[in-house]
């Protein structure tokens, strides 16, 4: 059911990335998403970073309009929807790239792990979008940047390959090319990734978010490595009108 909620707080997290705290607290599993509607603009899926927290990157008309809103303004939401992370594993790697941090942050906060390490990658220092309190929820934070302007020069997958033996389970969200490499490193075992496809209805009716035999909104957005074997994941996605789009 569509509900009107107010924006209680908004702040800049990184370059072109904002956080929005909403008035309604939701019961959710880390990895689930909501559909957020701006009247006269569009409706889009957004992963939850917390019970009433979303993080958004400015990339088009919808996000441009969302960025104009301030505290006290209203948006409309429905959900949460989809399947979240399982929470399996004792010593885990939580991997996020760019704006893939919201569901990973939620898992870090609410997961029950003996040991967890966050591996986060951004293109530059300016684009690091980590919540300030992330270190409270994990045992170690490792940051990589493509250009070496902060942390380790390279990618989260480089760190995973180097420290693979430390983890019995891996969770990840971010660019699909990165996720595909993580699946390869893990040989599709003991790994879950949050997939992204163009999504319209959010409830498994329209079929626009098809991924092999699955619908991302209904069967995902979180999938196990085994589920993604022999699918197009990591090879191509589709445009809103269904055409194949190379990654």
Curated annotation (Swiss-Prot):
Its cofactor is [2Fe-2S] cluster; FAD. It comes from Pyrococcus furiosus (strain ATCC 43587 / DSM 3638 / JCM 8422 / Vc1). Residues 1-87 form the FAD-binding FR-type domain. PROSITE patterns: 2FE2S_FER_1 (PS00197), FAD_FR (PS51384). [2Fe-2S] cluster binds at residues 201, 206, 209, 217. InterPro entries: Cyt_c3_hydrogenase_gsu, Dihydroorotate_DH_ele_sf, Dihydroorotate_DH_Fe-S-bd, Dihydroorotate_DHASE_ETsu, FAD-bd_FR_type, FNR_nucleotide-bd, OxRdtase_FAD/NAD-bd, PyrK_electron_transfer. Belongs to the PyrK family. Pathway: Pyrimidine metabolism; UMP biosynthesis via de novo pathway; orotate from (S)-dihydroorotate (NAD(+) route): step 1/1. SUPFAM superfamilies: Ferredoxin reductase-like, C-terminal NADP-linked domain (SSF52343), Riboflavin synthase domain-like (SSF63380). Pfam families: DHODB_Fe-S_bind (PF10418), NAD_binding_1 (PF00175). GO terms for molecular function: 2 iron, 2 sulfur cluster binding; electron transfer activity; flavin adenine dinucleotide binding; metal ion binding; oxidoreductase activity. Keywords: 2Fe-2S, Electron transport, FAD, Flavoprotein, Iron, Iron-sulfur, Metal-binding, Pyrimidine biosynthesis, Transport. One of its GO terms (biological process) is 'de novo' UMP biosynthetic process. Binds 1 [2Fe-2S] cluster per subunit. Responsible for channeling the electrons from the oxidation of dihydroorotate from the FMN redox center in the PyrD type B subunit to the ultimate electron acceptor NAD(+). This is Probable dihydroorotate dehydrogenase B (NAD(+)), electron transfer subunit. The keyword Mitochondrion does not apply. Heterotetramer of 2 PyrK and 2 PyrD type B subunits.
């Amino acid at each position: 059911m569509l509900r009107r909620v107010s924006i209680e707080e908004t702040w800049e997290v990184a370059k072109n990335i904002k956080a929005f705290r909403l008035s309604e607290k939701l019961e959710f599993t880390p990895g689930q998403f909501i559909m957020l509607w701006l009247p006269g603009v569009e409706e889009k899926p957004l992963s939850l970073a917390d019970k009433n927290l979303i993080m958004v990157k400015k990339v088009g008309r919808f996000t441009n309009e969302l960025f104009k809103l301030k505290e006290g303004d209203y948006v409309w939401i429905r959900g949460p929807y989809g399947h979240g992370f399982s929470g399996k594993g004792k010593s885990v790697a939580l991997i996020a790239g760019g704006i893939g941090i919201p569901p990973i942050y939620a898992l870090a906060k609410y997961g029950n792990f003996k040991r967890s390490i966050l591996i986060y990658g951004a293109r530059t220092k300016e684009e690091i979008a980590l919540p300030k309190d992330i270190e409270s929820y994990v045992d170690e934070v490792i940051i990589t940047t493509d250009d070496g302007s902060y942390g380790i020069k390279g990618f989260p997958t480089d760190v995973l390959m180097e420290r693979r033996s430390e983890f019995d389970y891996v969770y990840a969200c971010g660019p699909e090319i990165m996720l595909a490499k993580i699946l390869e490193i893990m040989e599709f075992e003991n790994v879950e990734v949050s997939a992204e496809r163009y999504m319209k209805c959010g409830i498994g009716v329209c079929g626009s978010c098809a991924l092999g035999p699955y619908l991302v909104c209904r069967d995902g957005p979180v999938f196990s490595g085994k589920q993604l074997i022999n699918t197009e994941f990591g090879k191509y996605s589709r445009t809103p009108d269904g055409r194949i789009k190379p990654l």
